Amino acid sequence: MTDQTTRLPIRRALISVSDKTGILEFARELQQLGVEILSTGGTYKLLKDNGVNAVEVADYTGFAEMMDGRVKTLHPKIHGGILGRRGTDDAIMNEHGIKPIDLVAVNLYPFEATISKPGCDLPTAIENIDIGGPTMVRSAAKNHKDVAIVVNASDYAGVVEGLKAGGLTYAQRFDLMLKAFEHTAAYDGMIANYMGTIDQSKESLSTEDRSEFPRTFNSQFVKAQEMRYGENPHQSAAFYVEAKKGEASISTAIQLQGKELSFNNVADTDAALECVKSFVKPACVIVKHANPCGVAVVPEDEGGIRKAYDLAYATDTESAFGGIIAFNRELDGETAKAIVERQFVEVIIAPKISQAAREVVAAKQNVRLLECGEWPAERAAGWDFKRVNGGLLVQSRDIGMITADDLKIVTKRAPTEQEIHDLVFAWKVAKFVKSNAIVYAKNRQTIGVGAGQMSRVNSARIAAIKAEHAGLQVQGAVMASDAFFPFRDGIDNAAKVGISAVIQPGGSMRDAEVIAAADEAGIAMVFTGMRHFRH
């Protein structure tokens, strides 16, 4: 068993980095600690120009860089110095004049940045595939018992602190080793993804006509949290987040108070937050079992999120119990007070939490309070995954949005301006309701949500039942459907309860019958040409 506390002194370091963030300060600290520094190319020049004593690798090996820099560190005096086992390989190292290298600070050619540039061609991409860097990283990681490998600038300070304490412990070197293998795995995965999208049948191997989906799919996620259990108590679970942070989301949120997030908390909070992001004006979304059970939008001058919460809650007070509440504005103290005095809530999430709100919610220590930060108006593209037995379904994120200008009026009666506002609102909500999804809305408030039924007309019936149970007036409300109506019965049912306007994708073989049903009832109907199935 390796002693976790034994400290490894550093006498010689090799530094060769593409990302030079913090490297000058790090090298100066090493120099002050008496560490001999070997370096290459641009890194050597940077150190030398700034007064840091370093030996160029070419001078140390006696072998100049060649092939336009393709071969720099691939030499026995480098890799023997890194891979040599102290106490085992000392004699052979001495015989060949190989000095031990105790620390390697390396990061790799910016392959991702290169291929992200417009017009990047395959030869350019290939020249930015690092060979010597990953080789040194893997060598040092393999021999982490005797060598420290540093691939992240964020680790420089910790390494210096350890050296000042007498050296790096095995536990520190093990952690650095793990980061190194994670780093090279992500790098190789990125290259494989890129190369796997190129059409090899084309002589030019142009990068302009690449497939959207690589031959093998490589993506890296980092464990953020181990959970007590999964969706059910007999299942184990953990929460992994993307290695590269994106827009504000459940994965970037900071928990300010409350019990540890559960598997279901994370899934439901994601659904609530992604839904509330759809709205520009102040909005509140309440979610239960990944379905919105209440949503409302209220302009600032009409009450903002405080009023929006009241309206969202009024949609379905029973389902809101133990739900998740998301806002697209800073949570203020007054709104927080209304929540904790009115209902039991699992999670509250907002881009920002005011100090007053924190103090109010602090009285309910079990409530999980999350601050996720602001998000851009334009949603970022990305991938969605669905695991099936033995496989993985991968698709682009559903970031499709519509505005009033995109609507196609298909009935004799055109919707009024207020109906259009409500139709667009209901459509945004329907996108986040499990299919078959039906949403009734009025004055930018949901008044009934029918979710997850095998029959679309049954979802419509449930939405009407929900509205009646909540004491909300359906007469004059609008209806949104996430997919087309295969038969006229959905419209006939809507007419019976007083729906005045309908929004749906269109595209059914029986669109003409459905439109006729709407005309017979005096219902205005618009097509979006876009479906929002959610399974």
Swiss-Prot record:
Its EC number is 2.1.2.3, 3.5.4.10. The keyword Transferase applies. One of its GO terms (cellular component) is cytosol. One of its GO terms (biological process) is 'de novo' IMP biosynthetic process. It catalyses: (6R)-10-formyltetrahydrofolate + 5-amino-1-(5-phospho-beta-D-ribosyl)imidazole-4-carboxamide = 5-formamido-1-(5-phospho-D-ribosyl)imidazole-4-carboxamide + (6S)-5,6,7,8-tetrahydrofolate; IMP + H2O = 5-formamido-1-(5-phospho-D-ribosyl)imidazole-4-carboxamide. Keywords: Hydrolase, Multifunctional enzyme, Purine biosynthesis, Transferase. It comes from the Bacteria. The keyword Iron does not apply. Pathway: Purine metabolism; IMP biosynthesis via de novo pathway; 5-formamido-1-(5-phospho-D-ribosyl)imidazole-4-carboxamide from 5-amino-1-(5-phospho-D-ribosyl)imidazole-4-carboxamide (10-formyl THF route): step 1/1; Purine metabolism; IMP biosynthesis via de novo pathway; IMP from 5-formamido-1-(5-phospho-D-ribosyl)imidazole-4-carboxamide: step 1/1. Residues 6-151 form the MGS-like domain. GO terms for molecular function: IMP cyclohydrolase activity; phosphoribosylaminoimidazolecarboxamide formyltransferase activity. Pfam families: AICARFT_IMPCHas, MGS. Belongs to the PurH family. The IMP cyclohydrolase activity resides in the N-terminal region. NCBIfam families: PRK00881.1 (NF002049), purH (TIGR00355). This is Bifunctional purine biosynthesis protein PurH. The gene is purH.
